[in-house]
Amino acid sequence: MRKAYCLFIFSFVYSISFAQNVAVINGKPVNTKEFLWAYKKSHNGNTPTDYEKLQAYLNLYINFKLKVLDAREMGLDKNTEYQEEIKTYESNLVARKKAGGNKDYDYLLNEYREGVLMFNVSEQKIWDKAQSDEAALYDFYSRNKQKYSKAFNEVRGDVIADYQLSLEEKWLNSLKQKYQVKINDNELKKLTKL
């Protein structure tokens, strides 16, 4: 009886804490307020009204968070240049906060930190690889030759772009296998009613 009671209490507490998040990625919650702030920022301050659009944006946001998680696991957040860049940005943000009283300070700083990490890890895993591995690039062209109507050297730019998309898709699929992602549809639906 005691175990059942403890299990009930644990389940209740978990459901309450989960309800304040739109998702959980590898045990780390994606806070509803942070997600809504990011959504509004990228949608000219508009509040979400369409569930499908909100769900599509959440999927993009989760992909972003997965890349950031991978960057942290690789130790990119420990890089001296990264830390110096963040300190410089934070100093500038503090100066603006004192001047203008920015209420979104924490969100802006976190967005910048994560954005730089996402850029750095994408550069390593996608962009540099597509630019420097000529054999892999040509192999990709050969396997998808029916898509291109011209010789490799004439469509190299298109091949690089397509190869980068392919690398990103494979990378995201591997991240989704590696890290557990749980979406809270009930919380997401509530956001369309705000």
For the regions a protein language model found, what residue spans apply to each?
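Peptidyl-prolyl cis-trans isomerase
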Residues: 20-25, 29-30, 36, 40, ...
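Sec-dependent N-terminal signal peptides
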Residues: 4-13
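Sec/Tat signal peptide C-region and signal peptidase I cleavage site
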Residues: 15-19
